[in-house]
Regions:
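Non-catalytic, solvent-exposed segments at the cell envelope interface
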Residues: 2-345
Length: 345
């Protein structure tokens, strides 16, 4: 009878999860063989009016192989363009800009939430408008969005038993408006609880926004590699309870199985990464043509990995030149074909 009770409990948790988290925005068709999903980390701190996504990353996933490219946009990106189909296009025909410089990419969420009349019938206008701006900036069709409230991220990580990952530099806990009261210590294969993982991902002390974007990608990669079917099944009720509090998305329930299948494929492959940050892109005066061409180049490069034929390469003598050992710099690049190299301690 125990297994019957457990199955019933899991079924009830699954029903609650799909009702609370998956808003059913409608099934989308993959664009050119890819699903493009906007991942947003939201933070409604005490010093803020409304929620603003502090991190915005597009996960572009090949529907056949699961091979994934993570494309990050800085929260302070100015003049984000809206596609002509967006309700905000007529209001901001030259991009999201204002005279005081406060019209950054992460402010679009709040603006649209305060102007819900522009999005009649849309459950989350802020997320929808941000998705549209990211489409305009990257040139990608964004199929779905996922919003994670950073306040509850700690609970979500704890629900799966923590996360094991390399911590490539010591990261302060606290800082800014509060006193630094500890550190996430550097080291290989550190097992972090939810509290430590949250601060590793969000800490701004002694680092830049761009380094924070790197750390957030490293946490994403570690979670992806760790979440196997056994973990999900054995801890489903805890995951479901935590997810209801911290995750919202417009992925319809009918697509959950498809997304899980892609995640399982993706975890077996290296993750490519690109960030639209200096020196390539300057957030105050971004070149959106350059952003779009860069996005296409890294996606094409990722696809070519699987399209190459297995041809023998001529043998070359090993290079005896000593190579400098990389240092744990506070600022790491995420322009890479394999994110694990960037995240390594």
């Amino acid at each position: 009878m125990a297994w019957t009770s457990a199955a019933a409990s899991m079924a009830a948790a699954q029903h609650d999860l799909t009702t609370a988290v998956f808003s059913g925005g409608g099934k989308q068709t993959a664009e050119q063989g890819r699903f493009n999903i906007l991942l947003m980390g939201g933070d409604a701190g005490q010093d803020r009016v409304g929620l603003r996504p502090d991190s915005m990353t597009v996960a572009s996933v090949d529907t056949k192989t699961g091979r994934t490219v993570l494309i990050s946009l800085p929260r302070n990106l100015q003049s984000a363009p809206f596609p002509s189909s967006s309700p905000l296009h007529d209001r901001f025909p030259h991009g999201f800009r204002c005279s005081d410089g406060s019209c950054m990419l992460n402010a679009i969420y709040t603006y649209a939430s305060e102007h819900r009349d522009l999005y009649p019938g849309v459950r989350n206008p802020g997320a929808q408008a941000t998705k549209e701006a990211v489409e305009g900036a990257t040139g990608l069709q964004i199929n779905y969005w996922v919003l994670i409230d950073l306040k509850g991220f700690e609970t979500l990580v704890d629900s799966v038993g923590g996360v094991t990952m390399d911590v490539y530099r010591r990261v302060p806990i606290g800082g800014g408006s509060t006193k630094i009261h500890g550190y996430v210590q550097a080291g290989k294969n550190r097992h972090l609880n939810g509290y430590e993982a949250l601060w590793f991902a969000r800490s701004r002390a002694d680092s830049s926004d761009y380094d924070r974007m790197v750390r957030q990608k490293c946490v994403m990669r570690a979670m992806l590699k760790q979440l196997d079917p056994i973990t999900v099944l054995t801890k489903f009720n805890k995951i479901a309870a935590a997810s209801k509090e911290v995750v919202a998305t417009d992925i319809p329930p009918s697509e959950i199985a498809t997304m899980m299948d892609l995640a399982l494929k993706a975890k077996a492959l290296p993750v490519s990464s690109a960030a639209m940050v200096p020196p390539l892109i300057h957030p105050g005066a971004p070149d959106y043509g350059l952003i779009r061409s860069t996005v296409q180049k890294i996606i094409t490069k990722s696809e070519n990995i699987d399209n190459r034929t297995a041809e023998p390469t001529p043998a070359t003598a090993p290079d005896a030149t000593p190579k400098p050992k990389p240092t744990a710099s506070p600022s790491r690049s995420t322009q890479t074909d394999d994110l694990s190299k960037v995240c390594a301690a």
